[in-house]
Amino acid sequence: MLNKLQKFSYGIARLGSSTLLGLFGWASVYVYWGYYNLDPVLTGWANAAGKIVIAVAGFFMGYISDITKTRWGKRKPYIIFGAPLLALAFYMYFIPHHFLGRNVDQFTLFIYAAFFNSLFHFSYAFLLTPFQAWMPEITEPEERIGVSALQNFSNLLANAISVVIGFLLPSILRQDGLALIVLGILAIFEVLLYFPSILFIPKETKTVLQPNFIKDMKIIISNKEYMKWVMVQGLVSVSMTMTLSLVLTYIEKVIGITGGLASLSFGIILLIVIVGFFYVWGRMAKKKGKGKTLFLTNMIFMIALLFTPIIGLMKLPFPSYVLGYLFIVLGAMGASGFHLFPYVIIADLAHKDEIDTGENRAGL
């Protein structure tokens, strides 16, 4: 059992790393394409490299940490080294001109972006996969709801912080000294939030069953419904990530909004609509089913996406930002479903599998 301080230490730790991940998702494309003028194709490849790295690293880190044996336990070493590494990669990614100069060639800038993008995503998997695997080893079932609630609060607060800073980032970057300070504070903030869990939570005493890689893979692949969902979620996730990462660039280059507060207004609306429609889609899912509701959210998102080029291709009889706000609202309504349903559907699949087989494989 964890005491209150230990529960708080574990639950609040992800606030910093989730903030960095959220901000990275919003701004990683904009910074290199819209600010450092890296070719958009190269910018896309640099970001794709990071996604590939986190997919591979996230898959294996759980198994690697399971077989780790140190005086600090299985999980703490990854937290001790992972938190500073994540902060360093985040900081370095956004300030290439301090190391490469302002007149750097495209290829060198691409290599720099791809390396630190990949390092950031590797560090995130290196840190978070063992950290989450730590929970069943240090908590009892009856206290996990409270700890998970703290983590959900941390993630929600992190999303709010990352949206606000993300939409202010173009203005922040134009003031070089301010950018170094803001990015530095965020990086230090992330490291400090993991320190309480390292200091106050003892190493795990319970031993969770050791995984059998081949057996577990056979179980996963044999579950056809789960595999279908993974494929669908993967395709939707790729398109959603690509779209959301271009929001800052779209607002600045297409809509023509460059002021910090004006850009921030788009971010605030985006956040309010996404969170507000959690309730709407949740109510609809109870009445109409999750499948129909998720299909509707994807259709709304697709319609918003199809009409976004209108602002750049047609002369409008009213200010472009009016239509921009409409597209942001529609897109946020669709994105809300993407953020709400995946974990719910995974839980439903795990529950169905437990009923069918009599074995609990939620961890897989």
Where are these regions (language model features)?
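Membrane-embedded alpha-helical bundles of multi-pass transporters/translocases
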Residues: 1-364
